[in-house]
Amino acid sequence: MASGILVNVKEEVTCPICLELLTEPLSLPCGHSLCQACITANHKESMLYKEEERSCPVCRISYQPENIQPNRHVANIVEKLREVKLSPEEGQKVDHCARHGEKLLLFCQEDSKVICWLCERSQEHRGHHTFLMEEVAQEYHVKLQTALEMLRQKQQEAEKLEADIREEKASWKIQIDYDKTNVSADFEQLREILDWEESNELQNLEKEEEDILKSLTKSETEMVQQTQYMRELISDLEHRLQGSMMELLQGVDGIIKRVENMTLKKPKTFHKNQRRVFRAPDLKGMLDMFRELTDVRRYWVDVTLAPNNISHAVIAEDKRQVSYRNPQIMYQSPGSLFGSLTNFSYCTGVPGSQSITSGKLTNFNYCTGVLGSQSITSGKHYWEVDVSKKSAWILGVCAGFQPDATYNIEQNENYQPKYGYWVIGLQEGDKYSVFQDGSSHTPFAPFIVPLSVIICPDRVGVFVDYEACTVSFFNITNHGFLIYKFSQCSFSKPVFPYLNPRKCTVPMTLCSPSS
């Protein structure tokens, strides 16, 4: 009787983790007690799997570490229990049949029970296979050991599955949090784009309203004047018809001719079906462009300009700005960039070309370009150029020339990729073009292709991917819209940033990465 009670007490003070009597027991808020070492190991396991909350290994109720308390009462019970030993009589009762009082010496295979010889002869066990305990103990010890090892293996698998699901849970949470952040950022960008598009569209409508109403007001004034003139003429005729014969005939031919030659002037009208139709912006495309710009901006480098000996180009002290200066003695230049197709000569020092070469562009000046001081020989590089308020410029990259104080760029300019120039340009305020290789008939004259640029850029971004052999130009003013991209560039030499303010005195400025 007493032994049964002691067994029950022992079960109550046994650690559910190590299955031994509690050592330095600690109580959780849920009521379960564990060894101090076991609960410490449980904490480390929770940290290993990045669990946000710790939970009881028995009931899985979460708890905070500061709520754990030492259980002095249970510790005292364990100490007393370790001192208690079963008396010989009580130990003897454990080995005797509770029903017959005989020694428990046999094992019933069918019922898997330890029995006495009287139990073997009872109706309950008649016909069953029974063995002496000594005969089967070793066999079942091996089976139990095998089962224990199998169970421990399954426990490891179960713990791994538990850890895997916790890891997957944490991974999903991280992924969803990341997606939520991206969604919020994307919609914020879309809102900015929509606000910009709305403001731009409203400005266009206000401009249209101003132009149309101004024209209609002018027409209205003209119609009022025309009506007033008609009234005065009608009044004159009525007065003549009602007056004397002399008044009737005085200057009658002149007034009749005025009436006969009179033509009603019709007001200028605007057809509503000819108005510009508003179209909602392609938000996905704009967002994709914005993402591409965000990606290339990660490679922003701080570019400064190299010194030069060109009298036409003035570089500021901070080496970020270049502007055109009209010298007293102008260079005898061939003229503007996109003139009519007539013969001209310009200087070029590109290998393989002559010092004076004839082409079919007119009035184009090559002698105001400057290079960046940093060479590009590998990797990805990005920079931005402020071209606001300029009516003409050329920018991009130039290959093969080391810039220094003695470098004369005007002797080395021929804007074709085969000669190491990957550039785009602007002239006359709104005409954008890209410079391509000239034809076989005009190998030293670049082939100039017009570009469609809806919104004129105040800033142009230039991105060079040396390994991919590409040069890209972005319209920063229009959400990073791709203006043009050179592919399969032959970067056999180092390349340098290139800026040409042309004959426009407004400066070009290299923007700092922090701008």
From Swiss-Prot:
Zn(2+) binds at residues 97, 100, 119, 125. This is Tripartite motif-containing protein 5. Pathway: Protein modification; protein ubiquitination. PANTHER family: E3 UBIQUITIN-PROTEIN LIGASE TRIM. The B box-type zinc finger domain and the coiled-coil domain contribute to the higher and low order multimerization respectively which is essential for restriction activity. The coiled coil domain is important for higher order multimerization by promoting the initial dimerization. Signal peptide: none annotated. GO terms for molecular function: pattern recognition receptor activity; ubiquitin-protein transferase activity; zinc ion binding. A zinc finger (B box-type) spans 92-133. Residues 187-200 are annotated as: Required for interaction with GABARAP and for autophagy. It is found in: Cytoplasm; Nucleus. The lineage of its organism: Eukaryota, Metazoa, Chordata, Craniata, Vertebrata. The gene is TRIM5. Residues 137-225 form a coiled coil.
